[in-house]
A protein has these predicted regions:
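Phosphate/diphosphate-binding loops
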Residues: 54-135, 201-248, 256, 347-348, ...
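Active-site cofactor/cluster-binding pocket
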Residues: 35-40, 48-51, 55-66, 148-158, ...
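Short helix-loop-beta junction
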Residues: 13-27, 78, 172-178
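Long hydrophobic segments that form regular secondary structure
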Residues: 6-10, 145-147, 154-166, 408-409, ...
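Ferredoxin-type iron-sulfur electron-transfer modules and their immediate structural context
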Residues: 310-314, 323-452
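Active-site phosphate/pyrophosphate-binding segments
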Residues: 98-169, 174-179, 191-192
Length: 452
């Protein structure tokens, strides 16, 4: 494979593993693209190479092919014509990573599988399911072992502190241990109030994995409402730890989980823990900021830092982060740390409870077909799995899809108080769901209006 940019680390990771299995594969890294050096390319590419895939992270509509592919192909063809190479390998070109599509180990395996074919596709895409042009390569299951010591996922709500907490975790692990730490953060344009997914890797070796975590040793659900909406337990490795922030007790929580989640936890033989982080945050005067509590729970359950060193490191990080806002806030966060360890409880796994609810549909049955197929998949966090045919060919989007996006994630219900309302109309203009609607009426019409 010939490529450049951030996908190199992923390719190297896969190639190193395949070489230990006796496979004859390699990756050639282009470090300087312009001016393109055909001489250095030919020196680096062994004569024994029989098939080459050139990957471009761009699309050139109207061109014969993508830029890097054309440069490599020209260099090889000219060398062959001039007698500088005795053989001309088969060269195919592919696209990857457009619009931030994932490029993981399974994509590299798919490219090598295509190169082994007797007649590989001369042009292909990888990391996308294209059922319109049929250029996409089928992705095999990633069977390569993970080099990470720990892989963790944190599902939070924008502004609850989950992203900041994970960034702090990376700093603590990187500064306080001999290990390497890496983080990726996925959140939508809503930011405050939207879903945030934090990906944390810890390894004894430098981390080359430039892709998101698909299967984790630890999954933290920082908002109980997410249990009904997102496939979190499904992303646990067998025997992994699943932590839920919930107001329910150890005896109550199992029956509250959807049957699908219960079945997955049993199948994976997971360890289930609960903590009432929202209650601790309220008691310590931290409002909705549960990040400190969930940080302590993560370190306590994973034992990444031994003994009380996690507590000491977190106290130091809190003092550094919040000292500018006053010692009182620092001490409130320290208090939350102490309460967090005492408030963690393990829930024994039980058979699937037939009386427990099933996962509700993401959108109402009354929704249009487009909302059921496309919007619903995106709301469930499965938008990347949508085929090309599911999306409008001209890129237009139907109007009014927000009305079906009822997330039901609030812990408290706001109540309009007539005596406090100044009728500024800001809430009417700002609310995307039109919970409160304004009407323009004449004084005469108001006289005939009902009382409410």
């Amino acid at each position: 494979i010939v490529l450049m940019g951030s996908a190199i680390g992923t390719c190297e990771e896969v190639v190193d593993e395949l070489l230990t299995r006796g496979e004859k594969v390699g990756v050639l890294k282009v470090r300087l693209y312009r001016p393109f050096s055909a001489k250095h390319l030919l020196a680096a590419l062994p004569e024994s190479a029989r098939a080459v895939a050139v990957l471009d992270r761009t699309k050139e509509p109207g061109a014969q092919a993508e830029p890097l592919y054309l440069d490599v192909m020209t260099a090889l063809a000219e060398a062959f014509n001039h007698g500088e190479r005795e053989t001309l390998p088969r060269v195919i070109g592919g696209r990857y990573g457009l619009s931030s599509k994932e490029f993981g180990p399974e994509c590299v395996l798919a490219v090598f599988a295509e190169l082994r074919e007797a007649k590989p596709k001369p042009r292909f895409t990888v990391g996308i399911y294209d059922d319109v042009t049929n250029l996409s390569l089928p992705l095999p299951e990633n069977t390569l072992p993970s080099n990470a010591k720990l892989e963790a996922l944190f599902y939070g709500l924008g502004s609850d502190g989950s992203v900041s907490a994970t960034k702090n975790n990376i700093k603590i692990i990187g500064n306080s241990t001999p290990w390497y730490a890496q983080g990726y953060f996925v959140y939508d344009s809503k930011k405050a109030g939207g879903l945030t997914v934090s990906h944390l890797r810890v390894s004894e070796h430098p981390i080359r994995s430039a892709y998101l975590i698909s299967q984790a040793d630890f999954v933290g659900c920082h908002q109980l409402q997410f249990i009904d909406k997102y496939q979190m337990a499904e992303r646990l490795k067998p025997g992994g730890i699943f932590l839920i922030n919930t107001p329910y007790s150890v005896d109550e929580v199992w029956a509250r989980l959807p049957q699908e989640v219960q079945a997955v936890l049993n199948q994976k033989k997971a360890r289930l823990f609960v903590i009432n982080a929202a209650k601790i945050a309220r008691e310590c005067g931290l409002a909705a900021r549960i990040n400190t509590v969930m940080q302590m729970a993560f370190f306590h359950l994973t034992n990444i830092l031994p003994g009380d060193s996690a507590l000491m490191e977190l106290q130091g990080a809190i003092a550094k982060s919040y000292s500018s806002k006053g010692q009182e806030l620092v001490e409130r966060n320290w208090q939350a740390l102490a309460l967090a360890r005492e408030s963690l409880f393990e829930v024994p796994l039980q058979p699937v409870n037939a009386a427990s609810p099933n996962r509700p549909p993401v959108v109402s049955d009354a929704a249009p077909d487009f909302v059921k197929t496309v919007t619903a998949a995106m709301l469930a966090g499965l938008g990347d799995a949508l085929p090309v045919s599911a999306l409008p060919p001209d890129g237009t989007w139907p109007m009014g899809t927000t009305r079906w996006e009822k997330r039901n994630i609030a812990e408290a219900i706001p109540i309009w108080k007539e005596e406090l309302c100044t009728q500024c109309n800001h809430c009417v203009a700002a609310c995307p769901h039109s919970a409160i609607r304004a009407k323009v009426v004449s004084p005469e019409e108001m006289e005939a209006a009902p009382a409410s």
